[in-house]
């Protein structure tokens, strides 16, 4: 019985698709192994199932094979000569860039009031609108900068006021301490002056008192 040829298109039935994937995957892994053994070739195979499951085979080390592949492709790209088509494309891009630069330079000169002698009414109106728009942007930015500076000055004022208050409190407590010390010294001197410090003179009389003498 002749086996029918399989049509190369996506299998719609999910179960049949999974069965076919398992069979073909095993066959592919087997072929990769046989190729590496029979031909002494470095073979690496990476397969992701429809559900994202990884299947891999490497005759040596998978990462080493990947690194070798990246080095090979990098060298191949770096040594690839620039084709005529790429050269023409680069020339076109360079010419287009120069044209844009010239247009920007001309627009800049017109905004500065230079080279407007040949401008039409429409072009002059367009330049005027651009200038008005620029002035509005500048004024808005200027207002914003003023607000930021005012806010910074307010914050600085608050910081200076707080520092001044701390210094005032510190100076007030120091002044009170000085006055307290002065009062204590004054009180001490007053007590010394008011206390009896004079010496008492005594005389020794021998005999009868004067009133009893005859």
Swiss-Prot record:
Bias (Polar residues): 178-187
Domain K-box: 87-177
Expression tissues: Widely expressed. Not found in the apical meristem of short-day grown plants in vegetative stage.
Cytoplasm listed as a keyword: yes
Basic and acidic residues bias locations: 162-177
One annotated Gene Ontology cellular component of this protein: nucleus
Principal subcellular localisation of the protein: nucleus
Effect of inactivating the gene: Plants are late-flowering.
Top-level taxon: Eukaryota
Gene Ontology MF term list: DNA-binding transcription factor activity; DNA-binding transcription factor activity, RNA polymerase II-specific; protein dimerization activity; RNA polymerase II transcription regulatory region sequence-specific DNA binding
Induction field: Up-regulated by gibberellins, vernalization and under long-day conditions. Gradual increase during vegetative growth. Induced by AGL24 at the shoot apex at the floral transitional stage. Repressed by SVP during the early stages of flower development. Inhibited by AP1 in emerging floral meristems. Repressed by SHL to prevent flowering.
Pfam family, one: SRF-TF
PROSITE patterns to which the protein is assigned, alphabetical: K_BOX, MADS_BOX_1, MADS_BOX_2
Coiled-coil boundaries: none
Biological-process GO terms, alphabetical: cell differentiation; flower development; maintenance of inflorescence meristem identity; positive regulation of DNA-templated transcription; positive regulation of flower development; positive regulation of transcription by RNA polymerase II; response to cold; response to gibberellin
Domain MADS-box, first and last residues per copy: 3-57
Family annotation (SMART domains): MADS (SM00432)
Keywords: Activator, Cytoplasm, Developmental protein, Differentiation, DNA-binding, Flowering, Nucleus, Transcription, Transcription regulation
Chain residue ranges for the region called Disordered: 162-214
Annotated localization: Nucleus; Cytoplasm
SUPFAM superfamilies the UniProt entry points to: SRF-like
Task performed by this protein: Transcription activator active in flowering time control. May integrate signals from the photoperiod, vernalization and autonomous floral induction pathways. Can modulate class B and C homeotic genes expression. When associated with AGL24, mediates effect of gibberellins on flowering under short-day conditions, and regulates the expression of LEAFY (LFY), which links floral induction and floral development.
Subunit structure comment from the entry: Forms a heterodimer with AGL24 through MADS-box domain. Interacts with AGL15, AGL16 and AGL19. Interacts with OXS3 in the nucleus.
Protein name from the UniProt record: MADS-box protein SOC1
Organism: Arabidopsis thaliana
Lineage, highest ranks first: Eukaryota, Viridiplantae, Streptophyta, Embryophyta, Tracheophyta
